[in-house]
Structures are given as C-alpha cells and as structure tokens.
Design a protein with these regions (language model features):
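Short, acidic, metal-binding catalytic loop of nucleotide-sugar glycosyltransferases
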Residues: 69-80
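A conserved acidic beta->alpha catalytic loop
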Residues: 86-95, 110-112, 141
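Active-site nucleotide-sugar/metal-binding loop of Leloir-type enzymes
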Residues: 120-132
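Cell-envelope/extracellular polymer assembly enzymes that use nucleotide-activated donors
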Residues: 49-52, 82, 229
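Membrane-embedded multi-pass helical conduit in multi-pass membrane proteins
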Residues: 29-33, 37-45, 299-379
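Short beta-strand-to-loop acidic/aromatic patch adjacent to the donor-nucleotide binding site
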Residues: 129-141
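Long helical/loop segments within the catalytic core of UDP-sugar-dependent glycosyltransferases
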Residues: 107-118, 122, 144, 149-223, ...
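Acidic helix N-cap motif at the loop->helix transition within catalytic regions
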Residues: 65, 91-99, 145
Length: 388
C-alpha cells in the first residue's frame, strides 16, 4: 500500500513537471523555423511619430545620467521625442546633472515606491499628447537609430512592441547566466510566439505602447509586476504584442548572487500573483477563443527553469536509487529539458565559457528553491536591484 501511494505521488509530480517541459520544448522547436526573425522594411519617407520616453529611476545615481546622455544621441528629430526621468530617492547632485540636460526631471514623493507609481506619476504630470510612450530602465542603453527603427515598425500598425533586451555586461558568472537566461526568454516567449502568430511577452523595459492606450491603463496598475499587468490588459483586449528582434536595448545584468536572488524572488512573486489574477478570466478566454490569454495563463504556471532542472535532477537521482524503472521517465524529462534549452540559446552564446558556469547555476538554483517561502502573493513590495 505504501509503495502504491508513492507511485501515485510520483506520477502526479511527473505529470505536473511534464507541462513545463512540454511548453518549453514546443516553443524551442518553433524557434528553429527562423533564426533571423521577421525583418521589417526600412522606409525612410515614413512620417516621424512623437515619443515620450520614460526613465523610472529609483536610487539609480550610478547609471541614470549616462543612460540619458546616450539616449539623447538619437538620430531622430529632437522635436519629435521628449525624455522624462522619474527621479525617486536620488541624490541632489544627480538631479542637478539631469537638470542640465534637455529632459524633464520629475521628483515624486512616495510613501512606498514602485515602478508602477513612477509611471503613473509621469503620465499625470505630462500635459502634451504623444503618439507613443517608451519605457526604459535607468541602466538601459540603446543605439542611435533606436527611435528611427521603432518608428518604422510602428507604421505597420502595432500598438504594443517589446524590443530585444540583451546583456551589456558579462563581468561575472552570475551576469553571464543572467544574460543567457534573458536570451532563452527572448527565444521561447517572444520570438517563437510571434512566429506562430501569438503575442510576445513583455519584459519590463524596452517596451513601447500607443500613448492613448497606455495613459488610460497605467492608472490601473496595482502591483510590483507592472509589465505582467500591462500584458494581461493587452491580451484581454485582443491587442497583439510585437517582438522587435532587431531593435536592441542593452540591459545591465546582475553581477552578484544576492542581487540575482532578489530579482528572481520579485519575478516569482509577480508570476504567482499574475497566475492567480488571470484564472478568474480564463473561462471567458476559452469562450472567446482568446488563445493568447490561455497561452499566457499556462505560461504563468510554469516552474522557473532553474528550479525545474534542479527538481528533475533530484527526482531522477532519488528514483534511480529507490525504484530504477520509475526513474526512466524522470531522466527522459531532464534530457528533453536540457536539449530544449540548448536549442533556445542563440548560437553565439553556445560556448565552452558559458557551459562552464553549470556549477554557479546549480548553487543559484538551490538558493532560489529556498526563497520560495518568501514569495509575496500580493506582490505589493518593491524589491530594488542595486547596480554595482
């Protein structure tokens, strides 16, 4: 009787993990159909849209001035875009440097800071109407033709665009792994989705929205997972999210294990909260055949990849010792997951140097598993990631 219960539990756990593995494998295979992405046609005569560019900056004294200066080098008409920095808990010296630049410096005072509140404050303070709003992180660096390329893409009629966010640093094992993880996400949740007509996932920065839509929805944000909330709004309304694979946004990757854990804890909290909030609208999505919404709901229930690999390895070893025949299905899932993730990694990153970081990945995965108990189901607390 005891072994019967163990066997049933084993099968239930395996079935649950299979959902995550099957999802990853499917989109990894889809991504193989096009490694170059979908190219847009450069139309120089395209009329210039107007952009409001927002830089929420919470204690970002080390990076914000440099990021804004780099952005102002755009080869785009200066009267067609405006930069606003939401300066929260920053030094006076930083704000003075920003004030010397042709940008608007907003200085909100929040009892409890969050990126959502910063975006809400910015929209409430801006009086001019724009065509689009761009959201960047304080450490983000873009190329000089960023707005030009974005403008051309938007002329195809998109209301929401997620640009290709990629690593700008690889100064530690943690930052290398963080950068690889970012590219796997780009492959599975953005490029592959667009290839079969589904919406891309948002990522928190490098995002562009129709200004009217954004200004009417930003006030509805209530959690620290503002990008997931915006994504749900878009999917419920049937608005397609385009992934701009060739419009790059260079993002500083975390370099320390502590920052990595804080970041992942924030993401896990956002994922759990998003999944719970999406469930109540799932029946409506089925009735309306809203495939994007159903897909996103399934995506929110996936086990984080590093924890998935750790759990599959653990179960494979345990079942090999306890019941070898039962372990075959676990080893199969582990191998399939490994192959799928390998396919999702861009070829340029499949190097001996990257794969030598497996030990670091294992240590980070164990720490992540320990942090599960700290998940904030309401996801109201803002967890800041320092830039060293």
């Amino acid at each position: 009787m005891f072994w019967s219960y163990i066997h049933i539990l084993d099968l239930l756990l395996w079935a649950f993990m299979t959902i995550s593995v099957a999802y990853i494998t499917f989109y990894a295979l889809v991504s193989l159909f096009s490694r170059n992405g979908i190219k847009t046609v450069d139309v120089p005569e395209s009329p210039e849209s107007t952009f409001l560019v927002l830089f929420p900056a919470y204690s970002e004294d080390r990076v914000i001035v440099g990021s804004v200066k780099k952005f102002l080098l755009q080869n785009y008409p200066q009267d067609k875009y405006h930069v606003a920095v939401i300066s929260d808990h920053q030094q006076e010296s930083t704000e003075r440097l920003l004030s010397d630049l042709p940008v608007t410096v907003l200085r909100p005072v929040f009892d409890k800071s969050s990126k959502a509140k910063a975006l809400q404050y910015a929209i409430s303070e801006v009086s001019r109407q724009y065509d689009y709003v761009v959201v960047l992180d304080a450490d983000n660096i873009v190329e000089t033709d960023f707005l030009h390329r974005l403008n051309i893409l938007l002329k195809e009629g998109y209301k929401a665009v997620q640009c290709h966010r990629c690593a700008k640093n690889s100064d530690s094992s943690v930052s290398v792994l963080d950068g690889v993880s970012e590219e796997i996400n780009n492959t599975l949740f953005r490029k592959a989705h667009n290839l079969i007509g589904l919406s891309s996932a948002l990522i928190g920065s490098g995002m562009c929205f129709d200004y009217s839509w954004f200004s009417s929805h930003v006030t509805k944000l209530t959690t620290a997972g503002e990008d997931r909330e915006l994504e749900v709004f878009l999917l419920r309304e049937g608005i397609y999210i385009k992934y701009a694979d060739n419009i790059l946004v260079f993002d500083e990757k975390v370099s320390s294990a502590d920052n990595f854990q804080r970041q992942r804890q924030r993401w896990m909290s956002a994922q759990v909260n998003c999944f719970l909030s999406m469930l109540r609208h799932l029946p409506e999505a089925f009735v309306r055949l809203n495939v994007n919404y159903v897909d996103k709901t399934v995506q929110q229930m996936l086990v984080p990849r590093s924890m998935l690999l750790l759990f599959l390895l653990f179960m494979s070893l345990v079942m090999s010792a306890a019941a070898p025949w039962w372990s075959i299905k676990w080893w199969s899932l582990l191998v399939l997951t490994g192959l799928s993730l390998f396919l999702a990694i861009p070829a340029r990153l499949r190097t001996k140097s990257v794969f030598s970081k497996v030990g670091t990945l294992l240590r980070l995965s164990i720490k992540m598993a320990r942090n599960v108990r700290y998940i904030d189901h309401k996801n109201e607390d803002f967890i800041h990631t320092d830039h060293k």
